[in-house]
Amino acid sequence: MQREALVAALEREGFAALVTVTREPGALDEHTHPFEAKALILSGEIHLRIGDDERCYRAGDVFHLPAHLPHAERYGPAGVHYPVGRK
């Protein structure tokens, strides 16, 4: 998926304007967000752990997190960069 396609899809799904996130290598312990999030990885990688399940998302992958879902984040050796829609 390209950035333009993501923007169009998010608008159709009622997400607010995109926010661009850049994270350095590292991690965030388990936490939640008060919003639903859908993002397209542009560079780097992010590992999302939900319960015992961990998935890795790399450039070109899209991840979707419901609001209030406990999860942990770990960023690859080059960090991660992605636009994300929130609602």
What are these regions (language model features)?
Residues 16-33, 67-68:
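Conserved short histidine dyad/triad with adjacent acidic residue
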Residues 51-68:
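Short acidic-glycine-tyrosine-enriched beta hairpin
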Residues 25-26, 43-46, 54:
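Short, charged/polar surface micro-motifs in flexible loops or helix N-caps
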Residues 1-2:
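Fe(II)/2-oxoglutarate oxygenase catalytic core
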Residues 32-48:
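Short, conserved beta-strand element in jelly-roll/cupin
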